[in-house]
Curated annotation (Swiss-Prot):
Protein name listed in UniProt: Large ribosomal subunit protein uL1
SUPFAM superfamilies: Ribosomal protein L1
Subunit structure: Part of the 50S ribosomal subunit.
Pfam families listed in its UniProt record: Ribosomal_L1
Function, in words: Binds directly to 23S rRNA. The L1 stalk is quite mobile in the ribosome, and is involved in E site tRNA release. Protein L1 is also a translational repressor protein, it controls the translation of the L11 operon by binding to its mRNA.
Single Gene Ontology BP annotation: regulation of translation
Biological source species: Mycoplasma capricolum subsp. capricolum (strain California kid / ATCC 27343 / NCTC 10154)
Family: Belongs to the universal ribosomal protein uL1 family.
Length: 226
């Protein structure tokens, strides 16, 4: 069993195990229990009453956080048709098949996210096994396969985050950094929970959201009222 650090034990002692906290108190506790020396990420985890084995209950998408993520994303746009629009939108890197070959042949990953126009997808499919495990494969559901590359790049730069339910029905999303003002974290949390409610599958019966947990990088989980 992994050894629990003294710092984590101290953080854990501040959180009542089975208590469900109001959002403002949960955010305050998350800041107090951040155990890292760097500016920790604040994450929210939704445990949903879904069965991801069913096609109509596989949840995936993206949401723009109104207060941003606190992280700068390097955006690669792959296109043969929207180069000018991508450059004007201030994409970090813009190119076509030559960049796909660079990823394939040079193991090049100087970017955080890929936006592609539809005509590039057949070529991208050839390196799907490289991009997929890294979570870098563009997907229409997350808005990263699109002809409107300007909007896609703008949304990412503003603070768009992607989400996907795992096989246990959990969705993990970042809502900012510990250094954010509580109001900004609250704003992002509300945007995220609104999005999760919006994508509720019609076939779900009973309670949709089972519980919500807030945490920081390497910090304890804090149950949140909803």
């Amino acid at each position: 069993m992994a050894k629990i650090s003294k710092r984590f034990k101290e953080a854990l002692s501040k959180v009542e195990k089975n208590k469900v906290y109001p959002l403002n108190k949960a955010l305050d506790l998350a800041k107090q229990t951040a155990t890292t020396k760097f500016d920790s990420t604040v994450e929210v985890a939704f445990n949903l009453n879904i069965d991801p084995r069913k096609a109509d209950q596989q949840i995936r998408g993206a949401v723009v956080l109104p207060a941003g993520t606190g992280k700068t994303q390097r955006v690669l746009v792959l296109t043969n048709t929207k180069t000018k629009e991508a450059e004007q939108a201030k994409a970090d890197i813009v190119g076509g098949e030559e960049l796909i070959n660079r990823i394939k042949n040079e193991n090049w990953f100087d970017f955080d996210i890929i936006v592609a126009t539809p005509e590039m997808m057949a070529k991208l499919g050839a390196i799907g096994k490289i991009l997929g495990p890294k979570g870098l494969m563009p997907n229409p559901k997350t808005g990263t396969v699109t002809m409107d590359v300007a909007k896609a790049v703008d949304d990412i730069k503003k603070g768009k985050v992607e989400y996907r339910a795992d096989k246990e029905g959990n969705i993990h999303l970042i809502i900012g950094k510990v250094s954010f003002e509580a109001e900004k974290l609250e704003e992002n949390f509300k945007a995220v929970i609104d999005e999760i409610r919006r994508v509720k599958p019609q076939t779900v019966k009973g309670d949709y959201i089972k519980n919500i947990t807030l945490s920081t990088t390497m910090g304890p989980g804090i149950k949140v009222e909803f």
